[in-house]
Amino acid sequence: MSPLCLLLLALALVAVPGARGACPVPADLKKSDGTRTCARLYENSDPYYDNCCQGPELSVDPGTDLPYLPSDWSNSASSLVVAQRCELTVWSLPGKRGKTRKFSTGSYPRLEEYRKGIFGTWAKSISGLYCKCY
């Protein structure tokens, strides 16, 4: 393999971890007392991954069922992280109505990249949620 190919491969491998941006690793989602957190939603997103998962945050405990998000969080989440062995189900309308999507373990720094139907995205579109862990 040529040195140029090796260099390009090395650069590609180094760039992959940055795709998570500033989001925490799913295994690190814990409260200060060490108890488990199911998911964490963030209000601010950015075209640059390094600036995502910042600003106000909403931590969701395992088993949380919120058909109506608090008024300051309804349709405002633009990044989220789901803890290990957990799943977050979201709805686009209050009362668990409208479009739905399940997010499994992982970091989702830009919800603009996840389609909600033909014309929309999940950025600033979450009005209800249910989070469960296994």
UniProtKB/Swiss-Prot annotation:
Any GO BP annotation: exocytosis
GO CC, one annotated term: zymogen granule membrane
Tissue expression profile of the protein: Specifically expressed in pancreas and also detected in secretory granules of parotid gland (at protein level). Expressed in pancreas, spleen, small intestine, lung and neutrophilic granulocytes (at protein level). Expressed by epithelial cells in duodenum and colon.
Signal peptide: 1-21
Posttranslational modification: Contains intrachain disulfide bonds.
Protein location: Zymogen granule membrane; Zymogen granule lumen
Keywords: Cytoplasmic vesicle, Disulfide bond, Exocytosis, Membrane, Signal
Gene3D superfamilies: Crystallins
Stated role: Functions in exocytosis in pancreatic acinar cells regulating the fusion of zymogen granules with each other. May have a pore-forming activity on membranes and regulate exocytosis in other exocrine tissues.
Subunit structure of this chain's protein: Monomer and homooligomer; most probably hexameric. Interacts with GP2. According to PubMed:10753942 interaction with syntaxins shown in PubMed:9244306 is physiologically questionable.
Protein name: Syncollin
The organism's taxonomic lineage, starting at the top: Eukaryota, Metazoa, Chordata, Craniata, Vertebrata
